[in-house]
């Protein structure tokens, strides 16, 4: 190989090679150098760039602060409605799995009656645990507003794969080979899968495909597109996690 490269350089000819592991190399590989050894990052993403990651985090903080101020009257009304609808706390805290598989507590306005089964699975439209007011705030995703506090804390991002409970993560990682790739970024309040109709009791395999596509193709423009689709119809109706 050295002789071939030397001969090509002598003649001013560019050389391209097909490595024996060609099938595994990503479309846009990132090369790291450790000592004299070159390493190919097999799953590099745009958010690996510290500048991109810092910009996204700064945007999350600024936008979540602004949205908390804008929605504070609505959140106050929701809190009163939850309190009057059924006995129990206003906020529902549920353990979810975040970036790098780190667990955190995600906040929601409580939409169900207090039982011992709220941590076990997804809700459906016919779920008897939901209160009438709870169904209303779920329909318009008002129950998700407290997650702006999760964004401020750094547990979540405005946009990213939706976080799931540890039980589901432990199950799906055995069934879906690329499932844990989702955990390489902060989970989001909304995501590419969700605005494409994959929410609640829908195909997990398709959801993972959309989540990984988002991670590999992240851009500021894509986040803005997802947020706009969320506001103008992508986040209304249907059942959520």
What are these model-predicted stretches?
Residues 1-72:
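N-terminal hydrophobic signal-anchor/signal peptide
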Residues 212:
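Short beta-strand/loop motif that positions the catalytic acidic residue
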Residues 123-186, 226-230, 234:
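A short, structured surface patch at a secondary-structure boundary
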Residues 51-116, 150, 220, 225-241:
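A hydrophobic, helix-centered structural microdomain
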């Amino acid at each position: 190989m050295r002789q071939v490269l030397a001969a090509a350089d002598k003649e001013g000819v560019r050389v391209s090679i097909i490595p024996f592991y060609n099938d595994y190399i990503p479309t846009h590989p990132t090369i790291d150098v450790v000592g004299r050894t070159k390493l190919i990052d097999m799953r590099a993403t745009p958010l690996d760039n510290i500048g991109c990651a810092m910009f996204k985090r700064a945007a999350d903080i600024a936008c979540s602060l602004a949205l908390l101020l804008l929605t504070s009257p609505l959140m106050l009304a929701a809190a009163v409605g939850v309190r009057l609808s059924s006995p129990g706390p206003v906020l529902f805290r549920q353990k979810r799995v975040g970036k790098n598989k780190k667990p955190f507590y995600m906040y929601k306005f409580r939409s169900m009656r207090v039982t011992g089964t709220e941590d076990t699975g997804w809700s459906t439209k016919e779920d008897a645990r939901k209160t009438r007011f709870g169904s209303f705030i779920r329909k318009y995703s008002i129950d998700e507003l407290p997650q702006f506090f999760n964004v401020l804390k750094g547990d979540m991002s405005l946009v990213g794969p939706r976080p799931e409970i540890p039980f589901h993560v432990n199950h799906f990682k055995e069934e879906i080979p690329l499932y844990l790739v989702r955990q390489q970024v902060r989970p989001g309040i909304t995501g590419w899968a969700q605005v494409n109709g994959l929410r609640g009791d829908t195909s997990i395999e398709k959801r993972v495909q959309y989540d990984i596509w988002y991670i590999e193709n992240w851009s500021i423009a894509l986040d803005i597109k997802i947020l706009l689709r969320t506001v103008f119809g992508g986040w209304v109706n249907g059942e959520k996690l």
